Regions:
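C-terminal scaffold of the Radical SAM
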Residues: 34, 58-77, 88-349
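Canonical Radical SAM [4Fe-4S] cluster-binding loop centered on the CxxxCxxC motif
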Residues: 31-68
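Flexible, acidic/Gly-rich N-terminal and inter-domain linker regions that tether
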Residues: 1-35, 45, 83-84, 365, ...
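Short beta-strand motif preference
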Residues: 37-39, 148, 377
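Short, amphipathic alpha-helical interaction segments positioned at domain boundaries
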Residues: 382-415
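A short, conserved structural fragment
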Residues: 363-373
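Basic, amphipathic "hinge/linker" alpha-helix immediately C-terminal to the N-terminal HTH DNA-binding motif
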Residues: 321, 375-382
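Short amphipathic alpha-helical interaction segments
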Residues: 349-363
Length: 415
C-alpha cells in the first residue's frame, strides 16, 4: 500500500508500472550518455539460503554453454551501432563470476569490440575466490575493482547465513600479493541479535584487511528464498544504522553512497548509480531513456533465445515521462545526493518544476539539506530511505523476481 500510494503521488497518475512480454530486437542506446554495462554469471558451488539473486548450481558443461551464449548476446547488442560506444564501467555479478575466471578475458574482449570502458571493470567475489591464482587471472583479464561478499567475519553470523568462514590471514596475503585499484567488502547488517559492537568489529577488520570502501547492506527477507531468519525491528535497525554511520564518519570515512563508507575520498564502487545501463546474461536488467527490460531467469531458455539470434528479454516496461523521472531519482538517491543540474540535463526540465513540493517537504521533515543547489540526505533521511527501500524491494523486486523464477517469459506484470 505504501509503495502504491507513493507511486501514484509521485507519478501524478493511477497508472501502474506495466511490464509486458515484448521487447525491442534493436536497443536504443546509441544516444544514451553515462551508460554502464553489467554481465551476470549465475553459477554457484552451493546456494546461500538468504541470497535473492538469479543463480544455479555450477557444472563445467552448463557454464561453458552459457558463456558461449553470453558472448553472442554481447555481439548481438553491440553490433547494432557503428563504431564503439563510450561507457562508464563494466561490472560482473552473479552467482559466482569467479567460477568462469578463465573466460572473463574472453568476455571482456568481446565487450571491447563494441564499447570503450572509461571507469574500470569490477567483479564480485566470494571470499573463497580470493586466492593469488584467481586474482592474477582476473587482473590479467583487465579487472580493476573487486567487491568481496564477506557478509560477516564472525562465526555466529556465518553459521546463521549458511556460509563458511573467511580466512583473514589468507585474504590479506592474497590481496597484498595481487593489489587492485579498489577493493570493496560487503556486509549484511540487521541480522538477528546483531549489535553495534558486532558490526563495528566487522568494519574495523575489513579496513585492516585493505578494504576501501566498506558496504553495509540491510538484511531483507525475500519471500522466495529459503531463509528462516527473522527481520530486525524498525527501532533496532535505525539505532544500529545510526551508530555505525556515526562511527564511520567520526573515524574519517566519507559516505560515498547509502551503503558505502570509504577511507579514501575517491574510492567509490557502485553498480547501481548509473543513468542508463545495458545488462547481459540471464536476469540482467537494461535501463534506457524510455524503457526498462529484464532478461529471462532461465539459463536454458536464455541460451535457446540466443541460439535463435533473439534478445532474451522476459519483460519490458515502457516508461511514462514521470515514471522515468521517479526511477532516475530513486536510484540516483543511492549516492545520498541529487544535483538538479544533472536532472535537468537528463530530462530537459528543472527538478523544482517537477518536484518542488516534495523537495520542500524533504527539507522541512529533516530528510535532506540543500547546499550550493545540491540536495544531500541527512542521517534521518538515509534511514528512511533504507526503510522505504525495504517496502520497495518487497513490493516490486520480490514480486518480479519471484515470478521470473517460476516463468521464463510471463505474459505481463503490474506493479
Amino acid at each position: 500500500m505504501i509503495t502504491e500510494l507513493t507511486r501514484m503521488w509521485l507519478t501524478r497518475s493511477t497508472k501502474p508500472f506495466l511490464f509486458k512480454k515484448e521487447y525491442d530486437q534493436e536497443l536504443p542506446f546509441s544516444d544514451c550518455d553515462g551508460l554502464g554495462l553489467y554481465v551476470h554469471i549465475p553459477f554457484c558451488r552451493s546456494i546461500c539460503s538468504f541470497c535473492p539473486y538469479c543463480k544455479t548450481l555450477y557444472s563445467e558443461e552448463a557454464c561453458s554453454r552459457y558463456i558461449d551464449a553470453l558472448i553472442r548476446e554481447i555481439h548481438l547488442a553491440g553490433s547494432q551501432i557503428p563504431g564503439k560506444k563510450i561507457v562508464t564501467s563494466l561490472y560482473f555479478g552473479g552467482g559466482t563470476p569467479a567460477l568462469a575466471a578463465d573466460r572473463i578475458k574472453e568476455i571482456i574482449d568481446a565487450i571491447q569490440e563494441h564499447f570503450i570502458i572509461t571507469q574500470g571493470i569490477g567483479i564480485e567475489l566470494h571470499p573463497e575466490n580470493i586466492t593469488p591464482r584467481t586474482l592474477h587471472i582476473l587482473k590479467e583479464a583487465g579487472i580493476t575493482k573487486l567487491s568481496i561478499g564477506i557478509q560477516s567475519f564472525q562465526e555466529k553470523f556465518q553459521k546463521l547465513l549458511g556460509r563458511t568462514g573467511a580466512d583473514m590471514d589468507s585474504l590479506k596475503a592474497a590481496l597484498s600479493q595481487v593489489p587492485f585499484e579498489t577493493v570493496s567488502m560487503d556486509f549484511i547488517f540487521a541480522l538477528p541479535s546483531q549489535t553495534f559492537g558486532d558490526l563495528k568489529a566487522d568494519v574495523d577488520a575489513a579496513f585492516e584487511a585493505g578494504a576501501n570502501p566498506v558496504a553495509l547492506y540491510p538484511f531483507i527477507d525475500f519471500t522466495f528464498t529459503d531463509s528462516v531468519l527473522p527481520s530486525m525491528g524498525k527501532k533496532e535497525k535505525r539505532r544500529l544504522l545510526d551508530q555505525i554511520t556515526r562511527y564511520c564518519l567520526e573515524t574519517g570515512c566519507t559516505r560515498s553512497s547509502i551503503w558505502t563508507f570509504a577511507r579514501e575520498k575517491h574510492a567509490s564502487y557502485s553498480s547501481m548509480t548509473r543513468d542508463n545501463f545495458l545488462g547481459f546474461g540471464c536476469s540482467a536488467a537494461t535501463l534506457l531513456r524510455d524503457q526498462f527490460k529484464i532478461n529471462t531467469f532461465s539459463v536454458e531458455e536464455y541460451i535457446r533465445r540466443i541460439d535463435q539470434k533473439k534478445m532474451p528479454t522476459a519483460l519490458t516496461l515502457r516508461f511514462t515521462p514521470r515514471q522515468r523521472m521517479i526511477y532516475y531519482l530513486f536510484w540516483t538517491a543511492y549516492s545520498t545526493r541529487v544535483d538538479p543540474r544533472d536532472f535537468e540535463a537528463f530530462f530537459g526540465v528543472p527538478l523544482k518544476k517537477m518536484y518542488g513540493l516534495e523537495l520542500r517537504l524533504a527539507r522541512l521533515l529533516g530528510f535532506a539539506e540543500e547546499k550550493d543547489g545540491v540536495y544531500s540526505m541527512t542521517l534521518k533521511g538515509a534511514f528512511y530511505y533504507h526503510y522505504y527501500e525495504n517496502f520497495y524491494t518487497l513490493s516490486y523486486i520480490d514480486r518480479m523476481w519471484g515470478l521470473l523464477r517460476k516463468e521464463a517469459f510471463p505474459e505481463q506484470m503490474e506493479l
